[in-house]
Amino acid sequence: MEERFRNLDYQNWKPVRTLGGDSYGTVYEIARDDGFGMVDHAALKVLSIPAAPEDFDTLVAEGRTPEEVTALFHRQVETIARQLMAVDAISDDPNLLRCEDHVIRAHADGRGWDIYVRTELLPSLPDYLRNHPHGEADIIRLGAGLCSALETCHRRGIVHGDIKPRNVFVGGGNFNEQVTYKLGDFGMAQFSAVDNTNDFMAPEVLCGAPVSPASDLYSVGMVLYWALNERRIPFVPLPPTAVEASDLAIAREQRLRGDPLPEPLHGSQAL
C-alpha cells in the first residue's frame, strides 16, 4: 500500500494521505494546484482487477489458459465500467456521493487493470458521528437520505451491495446548514467474494444469495440501528465494554438464525 501511495500516478493529482481500504481497493486523499493559487482536494479509489497478481496465476494453475483468465477479468472490468457510467449519469442526486471522473488503465504486462474513481472528498459517517452529537431527528434524516439514494439507483437497475457506515458520507453542515447524507462506493461488492465479516449485509447474502434491492434496504436498516445503538451492531456488548472477535461471531450467528433484534439503546418506540 505504501509503495502504491508513493507511486500513485493520476493525471496531475498528488497523493496526500491514505484514507482507508478494503478487499475492493484503496482510497486516497489527493490534491491538485489549480494554477490560480488554490488547491483542490478529492478522494480517489484505486481498484485492481485482479485484486492481487497471484490471482491470475492461481486460475491458470487450476487449468484455465492465460487467454481465458484474461477474458474473465476483462469481463469484470467491462461490467464495472458500465456500472460507473450508470452511476455517473445520476451523480447529481444530492444523496449520492458525486463521482467526478473515472479512468481505467491496463497493466503493462497485460494481466490486469487498475480502475481509478475520483469523487468529492467528504467525511464518512463514523468519522462525522464521532465529532457531532446526533439525535433522533438526525437519524430520521439519515434514513430518508439513504432511502432516497436507493430509490434513484434501484429505478435505474443499480444495486449497491455493500452498504455500511464507511460507505455513507456527510456533506454540508456549515453556517447552520443542514447536513446531507450521501451514499457512495457503488457496485464494487459485486466483483469480489462475499465478505463474510460484513456485519451490515443481509443474512441471505451472507449465505450466498445475490445482492438485491431488498438486501440494500436491510443494510440501510442495520446502519440506522448501529447509529441508534452507540455505533454497535445488534447482539454485541454496548460501550464501554470492548467488542471481541468472538462477540462478532456470535452476533453473526444470531442474525443468521433470525433471532429477534434487541431494541437499540436510543430512539423512540415510534421510530
Regions from the PLM with identified roles:
Residues 98-113:
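Short beta-strand micro-motifs within the conserved protein kinase catalytic domain, predominantly
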Residues 154-171:
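Catalytic-loop of the protein kinase fold
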Residues 125-135:
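AlphaC helix of the protein kinase catalytic domain
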Residues 32-81:
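ATP-binding glycine-rich loop module of kinase domains
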Residues 216:
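Conserved catalytic-loop aspartate of Hanks-type protein kinases
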Residues 142-143:
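Activation segment signature within eukaryotic-like protein kinase domains
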Residues 110-124:
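Conserved short submotifs of the Hanks-type protein kinase catalytic core
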